[in-house]
């Protein structure tokens, strides 16, 4: 156990660096970082297990920061362990710096997750804890790590905390320890203005082990973490009553603590000078690490070296006795796509693509032992039950199953799956109705930003949901999610792969693309209703190019008909009528516009040559295909919310028939 005077000095060092970073940047959040310094210092100097030489070590503990605005605290702490330089800290929030305004995932520097939107970070931790339990059930104690999370008042207020708290308690995630920085201050007000709930009782009701402490007292923090580590049945919440802006002083030397003004702005001028003096820093040169703090972390580095050496030795001994599991461990954490025998997938002709997806999922459940599939209480409708039928639910005390029942909580489910991907070793997929993807959008964006290969399964893809009516008909959703295909990630690639297959066989190809895509998230959009198969002889492998000419198309064509999903078969019906009038037709299936636009220009031109008349059909907004059709033609799409009626009636009323395709193309060619 370290001397408390040194521990307090180290926490003050973090406070100094955090406040100085924000002051120099003229932007940021110093108050929370100053209040949380005692906890994060205690965690990193005495408890968190990681390998300083191998930051990607799969057996490391994980620390998930929820309030990304407290980046100065995390950067300062990571500076103390050598992951950042003092010069890096000086460049907070600047162009090209490694210290952006909110932390961005970088394992080499000790940052496990990108954080910013409150509530998501601690839910990632719940997902990571599930992944760790899942892997431990298959590999044993070689994966015996602890997942730590840090949450703020704002994160607790976010609705997603309900789902995260419920799931963690229900599953008994005793490997999860969360510190709640309860400083009672937020950006605009004191928390008492917006909430009077008893947070401790709430988490206890969810099945958590809850402790209340002084969040700035080293002894109490230390004891609380030890108690949490001993817990064997419940996740732990440590409610630390912290002082916002601890150590801050006003220009006249009076206290500036517990003041909303310190939350989201630099301390400023003489306030900053007096704060630095109060904390024992040189206001003219605050970017320093005190000698005793350097010694503290040098000792911890030696301790970690010994701890990690013992863990590696245990792993080596385990590998000798469990060669198959050792091989799995290496394969699951290597970042490569799993090997799958796709010939095992036998599709039923004319099936709904959600049903075709179930067929694929049943094979994946058998062939990909590190895959977890989830559903938000819709497994028998979104057909993720194809996976479930080959495994069983993950439940408290038994993580040998591979199906995660998230309950009616789409955003929570998505964030948990992101957390699984962040932990590593697990391939997560989650399903719900396409219309409910609206609930998931913030998480999908974070998955894309972090370049995580989560598979999002969205069914009931258009107005053909039918009788349920406009509340359940995602008319505008395809256009929205395909914007993610146009948005580039920081590696210059499409931030997301979005696929909407035309029939059962194309569904298999789309799932193959999803499973081979280990660089970005994938959206798989499936139909509720049955869909006719594309013409015999169709080369479905061409779907990997995003768009391709469907078999049976005429060589010397007069018009190109293009669509994705179930609309392709409607185009085929219209094509039969057009050919009776002597019109030659090329039909193009476009499961992924983003992927198609990533192909060489020569290929794009060969499929959709400029100057040729084009007709697009989409069950969504016309804008979904307007970029591909351009000035060469027109798009038939839905420009209003949907309606309640049997889907075949809606097809007739809304013009999604072969006859209407025939009539619209005739007008185009007139």
Predicted regions span which residues?
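Thiamine diphosphate
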Residues: 1-146, 301-525, 530-532, 589, ...
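Acidic beta-to-alpha connecting loop that harbors the catalytic carboxylate
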Residues: 154, 183, 461
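Conserved acidic/glycine
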Residues: 1-34, 151, 155, 159, ...
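Short beta-strand/turn micro-motifs composed of small residues
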Residues: 151-152, 180, 375, 432, ...
